[in-house]
C-alpha cells in the first residue's frame, strides 16, 4: 500500500511540474512572439531606454553617465542612465552574444528585448510557485491556485512589459521573487533558503525601478514583525534570530546592489539615487518648455484632485481615472493601442467584486489568532449550544502578511499620485504594476469566498475556475493577435 501511495505521490508531482512547465512555456512563447513582431519604439520611451543598452553594447560593457549626450534625450534633456540600468546591461549582454553568431543589423533591438522576455517569464514562474503556497491544497482547491497564477501572470499589461526594452519587467521579476519568499515563509518559516531568496529579490528590486521599492520596505517590516511576534521561543532568542538572519539578508542585498548606489554617489556628488542630478540635467539640457522649472504640472496649475481625475486630454479615449484603470489592465504601443473597452470593463468588474468580497472573509486582517469554543448550556428544560469566539494572545502571521499586502498596494499608488501632481501628469497604469500581485491575490481570495458560498457543487465550481483561468490566459494572446499584429 505504501509503495502504491508513493507512486501516486510521484505521479502527482510529475503532473504538477508538467503543468508548471506548460504554463510558463506559454508565457515565454507569447512574450517572444510579441517582442519579435512589434516594431521598434513600440513601448513607452523604448527608444530612450534602448540608447542605454546600445551604449553599453557598443562600449564593451562601459556604463554611461546620466548626462552623456549619447544617451540623453534632446527634448527632455535627461536619460535613463541616471536610474538603475541592470536591465539594460542584460540586454547589452544578449546583443554582444548575438554578434558571435551573426550581425542582426537593424533588428538588434529585438535581441535586446529578450532580456525583458526572460524577466517576465521568470516572474510568471515565481508567481506559479508562490501560488501553491499562498493557496495550499489543505485549504483551497488546485483551481484557485491556477486562477491566481493566470490573473497575476497573464495580465495583458504585465505581459506587454516583457516585450520591449524597459526596467518594469525586472521589477515584476523582483516582486515575484519576494512574493515567493514571503509565501514560502508562511509554510516553512524563515529558513536559510527563504532568507537568501528574499535578499536576492530585494537586491534585484533595488536595481529595477524606484516605484517598486515598496517591496523592499514591506519586506523589512514583514521579516521583523514575523520574527519578533510569531516565533515560538523566548524573546531573547527571537532577537538573536532577527539580527543573525537579518544581518545575512542585509549583507547579501548590499553586496548585490550596493555597487550601483556607490557609483551614483561618486559620479553625482553624493546623489546616490540620481534623481536630483537627473532634474538638474533636465533643467540644463531640456528644450525650454520641458524644463522642470516651467513644465506645467497640476501643482503649478493649481488643480485639485477632482480636476485631475475628471480631466480628459483631446487625444485620450477616456478621462484620467479611467485611462489609468484601462492602462493597468492593458494599453499597448505608445499608450495609443487600447483593448476593447467592454473587455476592460469586465476586468474592472471582476476585480471590484473580488476585492469587495475579501472584506467578508473571516479573519483576513486579524493580527491575533482566534478560535471558536462550542459549549452546551442548560436554559430551563432546554440545552443550548453556544459558540464563543476566543481571541488568543498569539500573533497571526497570515494577518500580518495580509496587512503588508495592503501596504504593497497603497505605496505605489501614493508614489504615482505624488509623481502625477508634482512632476508629470501621465495617466499610465504601468506605474502601478508593483501592486499587481497583492491586488490579484485579494481578487482571488474574494472570488474563492464567493464561489465557495454560492456554488455548492464542487464539480461546477471547479469548472467555473477552469473557464475563468483559460479566458484569462487567452486574453493577452488575443491582444497580440487582434491589436498588435494588424
What is each model feature region?
Residues 110-138, 177, 181:
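Transmembrane-helix motifs of polytopic, lipid-linked glycan transferases
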